[in-house]
Amino acid sequence: MNRQMYNRFIWLFVWGVIFFVETVRPSYGTRGPVCRPGVARQPQWGFYAHQQINRLAIFTLPAEMMPFFKKHSQYLTDNAVNPDKRRYAVVGEAPRHFIDLDAYPDTSAVTLPRFYKDATDRYGPDTLALHGLVPWQIQLTKYQLTEAFRQQNVRQILRIAADLGHYIADANVPLHTTRNYNGQLTGQQGIHGFWESRLPELFSKDYDFLVGSAEYVPSPQRRAWQAVFGANAALDSVLRMERDLTGEIGETRKFGFDERNGLTTKVYASDFSQRYHDRLSGQVERQMRASVKMVGDFWFTCWVDAGQPDMAKLAKRALSSDEDLVEAEEQKSWLKRLFSAREEN
């Protein structure tokens, strides 16, 4: 199966999940799929938003990094969604995308340690996985990217940079910071995909993504936690404004139909989406901008911490056909596991 066919299948698979699967929390810590006809859930930030965030982050980088990142901009854009592809096939991937801050009675640094080792000493790895790992995953992936820069490993730089952009973007989504991640606890099922997929697709073309130049991050762990707490601070507005607008408009005017990939699908109506987006007063734009800036900052920081290798020189290196084959085989293995994975309750 070539890469184009693979990507088409993954797209159809994910939309199948959206239309026919409700994502619920299995007993040992991941949000996994359980078939439940007629209930929908979108992938994180949506493919569109994740890809745009990685692409736009490139333009925050300094001139020294630009030859390499501009050359590989298509790779970084296309592969921004790899973690979402893996989350259905790779054990342990799903918790890396979120953290349920409301699962902890106290989120102070003393009670909820900011470093993973300290947190596992306090709660154990299973509890942490149950409630999500995204701030710790950002820290880990940051160190991995720094090492890839240090080794001047082109393939690893690209793969890890794309993944890091994904996790950072997820950390900036309010609904990735709560157990009520899809409104399922408040009768607002579907709000996850509405906020992070439908709204960006409809309105992000008008957003201002001039976020300034990438800056060095002195404390990656502190920055990761600032992101999730900042996103969580917006959660009340996300839920309350949707609930209030639904009460005013009514369920019958809340939804409409749209054509996607030749299928007629139920979506949030354009008028409802516009009014909700207006009430949020730029919230989605702010979170996307924060994601773009943070991704650029972390890429830049990894490069600096690795000793600022010559990226113009690395840009001249061609990726070998063997490396392409290995990557293609890896993605095919994700596909095989999609069919062999059992359902988990």
Residue positions per predicted region:
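Bacterial N-terminal signal peptides that target proteins for export
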Residues: 2-12
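Bacterial N-terminal signal peptides
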Residues: 11-22
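Catalytic Zn2+-binding segment of zinc metalloproteases
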Residues: 168-183
